[in-house]
């Protein structure tokens, strides 16, 4: 389907025609995952809608995974608290963090994504992963501060999907 072929392409700010953009509505329970699945399956076969359905199930999986391991969330919150204090006392960390949050790193794609997120509350799903990778591996910033930046700005910011996706980028959510 068109969704399966094109969902991974970020066409730029405001040009998200290949993704559903339903996540903010699901987060606020305006619609439920079940509602979305029923609607999709009423219009498409399971084979046609398979990849879209997979993405809905990932959200549910992450929610259940984190709920059954609440210590992961508690540690993340403690880390953010500690790192927020470090931002006050470590000027190098603070400067890199501020540049990243303001979209002033000099990395064009990253800066555009930071500004899009701050201005619109949305970022394409793959841009989120690329952003996280640059945040951690290029800018050398703690993943927890990046996850916090996302949660503070994303209209669809979901504690489980966000935290566990950032953990996945840094290799903490995958065994091996």
Residues covered by each model-derived region:
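Residues lining hydrophobic/aromatic ligand-binding pockets adjacent to catalytic sites
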Residues: 1-176
